[in-house]
């Protein structure tokens, strides 16, 4: 799913997100991860020895994941902003790891649903967009 200009700019300003996957026992696992967004709106998640991690195995098994990227803009007044992406996920290999020493193994998240709050100028509350079927 294509991201808006405001969403792209926001994501470029944030170094970390939290990836949620579901384990074999049905329990949700959430981990901080580095990411970058491709031109097509998919998210590439990398790391050290990624193929050895539970999140990688969870994605390989279920083909689903969610990523939240958010921050606290101000405490007074209270202002938060963020993006949650839910969708299809796959394990893959890249020829150009995200940073020196990173594994060539990656998780690619293709968004089916995007929630945003505080990112789009003038949009109050949370907004939701779903991939057209």
Q: What residues fall within each predicted segment?
A:
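Structural motif
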Residues: 41-42, 64, 88, 113
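Residues located in well-ordered beta-strands
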Residues: 18, 86-88, 110
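C-terminal edge-of-domain segments
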Residues: 93-133
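Short beta-strand segments
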Residues: 15-49
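Short, structured beta-strand-loop surface elements
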Residues: 49-105
């Amino acid at each position: 799913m294509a991201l808006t200009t405001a969403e792209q700019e926001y994501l470029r300003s944030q170094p970390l997100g939290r990836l949620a996957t579901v384990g074999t026992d049905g329990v949700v696992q959430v981990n901080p991860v580095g990411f970058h967004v491709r031109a097509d709106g998919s998210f590439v998640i990398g790391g050290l020895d990624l193929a050895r991690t539970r999140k990688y195995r969870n994605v390989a098994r279920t083909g689903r994941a969610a990523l939240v990227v958010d921050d606290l803009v101000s405490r007074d007044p209270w202002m938060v902003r963020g993006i949650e992406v839910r969708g299809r996920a796959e394990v893959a290999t890249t020829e150009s790891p995200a940073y020196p020493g990173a594994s060539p193994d990656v998780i690619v998240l293709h968004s089916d649903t995007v929630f945003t709050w505080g990112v789009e100028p003038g949009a109050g509350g949370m907004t939701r967009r779903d991939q057209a079927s």
